[in-house]
């Protein structure tokens, strides 16, 4: 009976894997087709590896500039996020003061607050301070919008770390800053890696806020650039270039997915947290 159940679970897992991976495979396959090949049979394998589609996508939709903007936004947003989230999570996990529980509860409640709910007032506020079409401002907005989830997640990781490590380091003369940087950060690396990867992928793929806050073509990010690819092609859609552009967008996300499990294997607790 257990054998039958095990095989049923395996078959279901294989089916779900095929369902989720096939669109990625189809997108990659279509990126190498000519327009005639795609219109003749969208599901057939490409006759040859047509790299001209990637060149066309890179040039027609100005993806080179958008790619650079997306890299800048993702890196700066993630850096700002970690700069604030790590100390805030540490304070909320380790110190008890008036209002600490209320602050934690507010952060947890804000997890359910989506960016689309505050998009109009946010647009008006940034317009009033000339904050539109400004990539650093967009990075700050991204980081702040991700605060609730990341603080809630990292606070849980830090709360689970035994206090003995910090007490030993304090006996050795460690300051509060040293406790954070040399004790808690190394011990909380799995949590930090988790929020870093999830946030970076979210920043890379974010569309609604970038669409509203970036109206200058030179400041737009990759997801907005793909919409531009539709615009420049009008009614004569170059399907190969379109799918090639989607592949370019997916590459950083796929790299993060591939290196994520490898990096997790090296995130172990150090035997001597404070040096």
Show which residues each predicted segment covers.
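A structural signal for multi-pass alpha-helical bundles of membrane permease subunits
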Residues: 2-263, 267
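Single conserved hydrophobic/aromatic residue that forms the stacking wall/gate
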Residues: 266, 271-275
């Amino acid at each position: 009976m257990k054998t039958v159940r095990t095989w049923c679970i395996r078959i279901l897992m294989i089916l779900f894997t095929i369902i989720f991976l096939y669109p990625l495979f189809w997108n990659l396959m279509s990126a190498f087709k000519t327009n005639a090949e795609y219109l003749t049979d969208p599901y057939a394998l490409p006759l040859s590896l047509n790299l001209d589609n990637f060149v066309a996508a890179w040039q027609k939709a100005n993806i080179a500039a958008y790619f650079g903007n997306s890299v800048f936004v993702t890196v700066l947003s993630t850096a700002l996020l970690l700069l604030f989230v790590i100390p805030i999570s540490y304070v909320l996990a380790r110190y008890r003061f008036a209002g600490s529980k209320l602050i934690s509860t507010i952060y947890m409640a804000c997890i359910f607050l989506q960016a689309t709910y505050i998009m109009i007032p946010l647009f008006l506020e940034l317009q009033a301070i000339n904050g539109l079409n400004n990539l650093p401002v967009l990075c700050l907005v991204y980081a702040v919008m991700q605060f609730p989830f990341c603080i809630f997640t990292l606070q849980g990781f830090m709360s689970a770390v035994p206090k003995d490590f910090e007490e030993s380091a304090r006996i050795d003369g460690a300051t509060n800053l040293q406790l954070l940087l040399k004790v808690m950060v190394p011990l909380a690396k799995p949590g930090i890696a988790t929020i870093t990867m999830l946030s970076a992928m979210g920043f890379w793929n974010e569309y609604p806020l970038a669409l509203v806050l970036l109206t200058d073509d030179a400041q737009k990010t990759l997801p907005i650039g793909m919409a531009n690819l539709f615009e420049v092609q009008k009614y004569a859609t170059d399907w190969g270039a379109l799918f090639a552009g989607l592949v370019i967008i997916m590459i950083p996300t796929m790299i993060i997915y591939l290196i994520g499990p490898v990096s997790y294997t090296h995130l172990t607790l150090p035997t001597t947290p404070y040096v």
